[in-house]
From Swiss-Prot:
Homology family: Belongs to the endoribonuclease YbeY family.
Subcellular location field: Cytoplasm
UniProt cofactor note: Binds 1 zinc ion.
Chief subcellular location: cytoplasm
NCBIfam families according to UniProt: rRNA maturation RNase YbeY
InterPro entries, alphabetized: MetalPrtase_cat_dom_sf_prd, YbeY, YbeY_CS
Record-given protein name: Endoribonuclease YbeY
Organism: Roseiflexus sp. (strain RS-1)
Gene: ybeY
Superkingdom of the organism of origin: Bacteria
Annotated signal peptide: none
EC supergroup of this enzyme: hydrolase
Assigned EC number: 3.1.-.-
Summary of the function given for this chain in its UniProt record: Single strand-specific metallo-endoribonuclease involved in late-stage 70S ribosome quality control and in maturation of the 3' terminus of the 16S rRNA.
Length: 160
């Protein structure tokens, strides 16, 4: 397996399958990995679901009984009970995104659904890579700047 191999396992609940651009999701993942200089083969899981699905996950894992736009579940290397083969891709974790939030937030912020979807994928990826906007105002500013740099590289900046 080469360093350039990336596995993005995308699951879309049926009502949204016709609207979700899986190629854009893969591009956003790859661009984030490249710009963050993540080497080697990696694997990421992405679920596109609805507000109810995100609310269930938010309640189960964060104790917040409300829907949200994106949740990230980073894989901690030391928590695994299994030994990975040396050539296996590094599993970064999973990202869950509400398509209903993609649509609503795109309208609210006055940009395309594509930009909003890419933003949420990039946001989730940065969380999987250790960024945390809730740690401090400086960390939030750093993460926001990085998100915009990656979106600009994708041709989806706020100015475009």
């Amino acid at each position: 397996m080469s360093d350039s191999e990336r596995t993005v396992d995308i699951q879309v609940v049926p009502p949204y399958a016709a609207y979700v651009d899986s190629a854009l999701i893969e591009q956003a993942v790859e661009c984030t990995l490249q710009m963050e200089q993540v080497a080697g083969p990696v694997e990421v899981g992405i679920l596109i679901t609805d507000d109810a699905g995100l609310q269930r996950l938010n309640q189960a894992y964060r104790g917040v009984d409300a829907p949200t736009d994106v949740l990230s579940f980073a894989e901690a290397d030391d928590d695994s009970a299994f030994v990975r083969p040396p050539d296996a891709p590094r599993y970064l974790g999973d990202i869950a995104i509400s398509w209903e939030r993609v649509v609503a937030q795109a309208a609210e912020y006055g940009h395309s659904r594509e930009r909003e979807l890419a933003f949420l994928v990039v946001h989730g990826m940065l969380h999987l890579l250790g960024y945390d906007h809730e740690r401090s105002p400086a960390d939030e500013a750093d993460m926001r700047a990085r998100e915009e740099e990656i979106l600009r590289a994708l041709g989806l900046s706020r100015e475009e």
